[in-house]
Amino acid sequence: TVLFLDADEVPDGRRFTEWLDCSDYRHNTALKLANYWYFREPSNQALRFEDTVVLAQKRALESEILLHQDERDAIYNLLPGPKRRHVAGSDGNPMFHHYSWVRTKEEMLQKVRAWGHKDDRDWVTLVHEEFAAPFRGTDFVHGYSYRAVKPCFEIHFDEIHFEPKGTPQV
């Protein structure tokens, strides 16, 4: 089994491990796992879930699928069933946190100038408008509505901050 996720998609390790131990994921060729989505700050959590993380059976993966331009969507869409989307943890809540748009203004400008959708909209103007005022409760990417939550993880914009946890497994 292979887990496909981006660096800004962070698992709740304990809950994901519990789910792996008690779920029937091996009976599916591919799963899209539900995730929370955040914007601007790690405390701004969308009311709507996404499912960008993919868990796929290694035996079903082929190089054409892995190298497809649609990346994880292709992995899920092109593999045969059985498959499931919006898979949540044992408690019914997402096990992953997606921080794709949790960035400073400068980082967000850098992102929109470089990403594959840069010509879809006038992203630079949207970023400037977004940061001209406090967060308004909706994002300019999807138009999701948000709620304020206590961040699950500390995210520092000023510097890289490593906090040792547990025993090193080296």
Per-region residue spans from a language model:
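A conserved donor-nucleotide-binding helix/loop in the catalytic core
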Residues: 1
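Catalytic-site signature of metal-activated, phosphate-bearing donor transferases
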Residues: 4, 9-170
